Amino acid sequence: MNFFYYKDFYQLSEISVGQHYYWQISNFQVHGQTLMTSWFVISLIMIIAFLSNLNMKKIPLAKSFQNLAEFVTEFILDLARTQVGKEDYLNWVPFLGAVFLFIFVSNWGGALLPWKLLELPNGELAAPTNDINTTVALALLTSFSYFYAGISKKGISYFGRYVQPTPFLLPINVLEDFTKPLSLSFRLFGNLLADELVIAVLVSLVPLFVPVPLMLLGLFTSAIQALVFSTLAGAYIGESVEDHH
């Protein structure tokens, strides 16, 4: 072990909060590092999906992409059925599956891949979900989805839910629609940022074996955050399409 060995560990432990590598697109500035890692995550999901459909067998091998894909599909089907309801869940399996897989792969990619070794002119590469803009976009997409679900099924009568069970609850029910995307986005962003900060501090202090258990715990909490987000998204859609009496 020499100086350069420890230097690599300290480089991994560095974290730049609030610094971004900007791309200028027309009159807009966008976070370039977030777009790059988002494209990487989407490409990885598409590659695994493609490999899962090659040489499909009636009984897949235990260690195969097909077996993994079937397990994930069954999990998402069960999640959608439980949260949305048996009548409407099939329409929302693609959306909930896309949200869950994007967040899950993003979170695990941020925990497992040494993004910080790839240098940028400013800022650093990190999981897409480590950017508040990504989590807010996912939360707003969820909000639009449950509005669409309710209006497409019930029409204008969907808005009757705001005065149920009593008209006095109208302000609270309206406020709830604003707090849902806020809680979704800040919960996901805050948990991931806190996990990365804790691990970065511990790696800088004790760069060898002590942070490993926390990194494993980070993988677990990252998976839980993907599950929580997609479960709440399904629950909100389920509330929109259920019949109120």
Curated annotation (Swiss-Prot):
GO terms, molecular function: proton-transporting ATP synthase activity, rotational mechanism
Keyword presence, Plastid: yes
Gene3D superfamilies, A to Z: ATP synthase, F0 complex, subunit A
CDD domains listed in its UniProt record: ATP-synt_Fo_a_6 (cd00310)
One GO cellular component term: proton-transporting ATP synthase complex
Compartments it resides in: Plastid, Chloroplast thylakoid membrane
Highest rank taxon of the organism: Eukaryota
Transmembrane segments annotated in the record for this chain: 34-54, 93-113, 132-152, 197-217, 218-238
Chief place where the protein resides: plastid
KW Phosphoprotein (keyword) present: no
Record text on subunit structure and interactions: F-type ATPases have 2 components, CF(1) - the catalytic core - and CF(0) - the membrane proton channel. CF(1) has five subunits: alpha(3), beta(3), gamma(1), delta(1), epsilon(1). CF(0) has four main subunits: a, b, b' and c.
PANTHER family attached to this UniProt entry: ATP SYNTHASE SUBUNIT A, CHLOROPLASTIC
Family: Belongs to the ATPase A chain family.
Designated name of the protein: ATP synthase subunit a, chloroplastic
Organism from which the protein derives: Bigelowiella natans (Pedinomonas minutissima)
